[in-house]
């Protein structure tokens, strides 16, 4: 019963965070599909007019949300965004969103001067699973972009609420055997299909 109440409170918090007034300035390079979005935003002109972030940051965060929690609720998507941003703020990880998402071993193809992740040698499995990392156009991608955009704006405005309470790690709750690192960190929350853990130093 207590877990159910905590989950409901987490979901309500996520919805409250994502419906706070904001602007929509997603780059023209990102394609939206004209489908009904499950999240309705209340817009307020110039609310975040001084907040800036790059299109690359937006795409990296949206891709991480899409592949890690695309089928989950708004709370599940926001939780992945929180962990990504928490890692960026931690001295234990790269200090950029894309650096965090793409952290891991790479090889350099000198013929075309491009780096590729080594199979199963990265932090987020979708990035190095050998599959094409191209999202399918539709509602799931659109909402992932929307959550990423709002999370970035509120992060840089220092008003983003962290529903994972500082977590830097998570794993699926359906795993029969948890990763070894899970026993060395503090469990902070269970949101949708992931269990979240906290550790590390912060900048």
Give each language-model segment a name.
Residues 2, 25-203:
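Bacterial extracytoplasmic/cell-wall-associated proteins, especially those involved in peptidoglycan
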